Every structure is written in C-alpha cells, then in structure tokens.
Amino acid sequence: MAEASSFLAQKRYAVVTGANKGLGLEICGQLASQGVTVLLTSRDEKRGLEAIEELKKSGINSENLEYHQLDVTKPASFASLADFIKAKFGKLDILVNNAGISGVIVDYAALMEAIRRRGAEINYDGVMKQTYELAEECLQTNYYGVKRTINALLPLLQFSDSPRIVNVSSDVGLLKKIPGERIREALGDVEKLTEESVDGILDEFLRDFKEGKIAEKGWPTFKSAYSISKAALNSYTRVLARKYPSIIINCVCPGVVKTDINLKMGHLTVEEGAASPVRLALMPLGSPSGLFYTRNEVTPFE
C-alpha cells in the first residue's frame, strides 16, 4: 500500500472495536500486516483472546497484536482501556469504530423460505422482529458507543502527529433513505449540526418507536434503529470533522460483506470489505476529512 508509506514511516498504534470476528478481525489483520500495532477489543474477553491467537496462526507478527476488553455500551469500560493505551503506547494514531449490531432478531428459517420462493417479494416484517429494547440497544452500540469511544480516546489521539478516526457505517444511513423530509433536513444541515442536535433526533426516534409511530413520523421502517443509528453516525462524523480539523475523520460503508450482521449473505468477502476502512486508516497526510465513502468512492451524505 504505497500511499500509506509516509504515514507508516513512524511506529503507529491502532484500536479497533468489535474486533473478535468478521470485519473487525480482518481490519486488525490487515493493519497489523502493514506494521501497525493493533489493539483488538471485544465485549467478550475469551473470544477476543481467541481472535488474537487466530491472527497469530495466520502469520501475523505477534509483536503487532495486543488485546483489551471493551464493551462500548458500558461507560466503565473506557477508563482501563485509556490507561492501558497510555501506559503501553503513549499515544493513539488510528481509531476504527467497528462495533455494531443490527437491532433486529431474524427468523432465519422464515427468511430462507422467503428467498427460496423465487420472484416473491420478501415481507421483512414477517422475518425480522424489532422491539423498543432492541432499538435502544442498537443506538447505544452503533451511535452512543462510538461517541463514548471517541470521547475516551481523544486525548490519546491528540498525542499523535497524524491522528485519524474511521467510523464504519452503512449506506442505509444515507439521508435519501429516510422518508421524512424534516428528519433529513435536521440531520443534513451541516452548518447547524451539533452533537446535541443529533442526540435530540435519536431521542425523538425512540419516543416515536415506543408509541408505534415510526412510519407515521417518517422514520425508516426497514431495520429502523440500525438505519437511523448509521444516519446519526454519519452526521456526528461531520460534526467531529469540523470540530477537530487536525484529525482525519471519515465514515465508510464497506459494502455488503459476508458477516454475521448480514446473515453471511453479502457478496463481498471480509478481506474485500475490510480493505476500505483500512485504506482510510492509512491515508496519507493531508487527506480529506468529514466524508462518507462507499467502499473507495466518496458518496454524498444526502
């Protein structure tokens, strides 16, 4: 990766969240293969340590791999992580916010049956269950979890001479996917966007969800919480990029990858999917910030 050579001239340190399997694990492997020391994090310590061993067995240099437990939904998780990074590395150069959940429970057998009926339109309401509790957990992981992680690790990123943050997002969070014009405008007005205004939109979403008014109020109905969590993440990325011009901050849709969150039904391998977040993590100095990428192409937030 020639374009990353100048950035990698010095020893670099990265944190990847939600990294014990799938896309996160592959991102760790690809970064470590470039000589970056990667701190793999996961909710489950046992699975995280097993993931480290898996990377070592694949030929990754063990000197480029570290592990620390992190549950992005638990504020108490972050103090020990930050202390570990400060003591071990003294700084942080790369943060990849990959941890995420779908916010739905899928009836896999019913979905497979629907797919087998060629030509039949799938009734996703019949195969995907959405509840208020799931919606709340989804927002806490996919949006607030990213905020917690960034807030906790920002002081360490500011010790780097070229810090960058990559937020793994999805094109379902593009504004054009949101039916309600008022919601689109609120999340898309970059001049007026603040963290507080984005938080307020999510509070409104949860109230409408609890009252059964998702469709009526113009929210996405397909994987509602997941979609709006990614839309909020995209807006938050734009807010951060304006607030911290010295940090390269972007979000990326890696494509539909064969991972658990996509029921292994994607058309891209994890190797292909991880390539775009890794490319953003290793972008050369002076690269653009505050953008949304669909794989390797810049895509309008709208």
Curated annotation (Swiss-Prot):
Tissue expression summary: Mainly expressed in flowers and flower buds, to a lesser extent in leaves and, at low levels, in stems and roots.
CDD domains in UniProt: carb_red_PTCR-like_SDR_c
GO terms under cellular component: membrane
Transmembrane residue ranges: none
Name this polypeptide is given: Short-chain dehydrogenase/reductase 1
Disulfide pairings: none
Cited PANTHER family: (+)-NEOMENTHOL DEHYDROGENASE, OS02G0640600 PROTEIN
EC numbers: 1.1.1.-
Binding locations of NADP(+): 20-23, 43, 71-72, 98, 226, 230, 257-262
Pfam families, per database record: adh_short, adh_short_C2
Pathway annotation from the record: Secondary metabolite biosynthesis; terpenoid biosynthesis
Gene Ontology biological process: saponin biosynthetic process; triterpenoid biosynthetic process
Function: Component of the oleanane-type triterpene saponins (e.g. saponarioside A and saponarioside B) biosynthetic pathway, leading to the production of natural products with detergent properties used as traditional sources of soap. A dehydrogenase/reductase that, together with UGT74CD1, mediates the conversion of QA-tri to QA-triF; UGT74CD1 may transfer 4-keto-6-deoxy-glucose to QA-tri, which is in turn reduced to D-fucose by SDR1, thus leading to QA-triF formation via the initiation of the C-28 sugar chain.
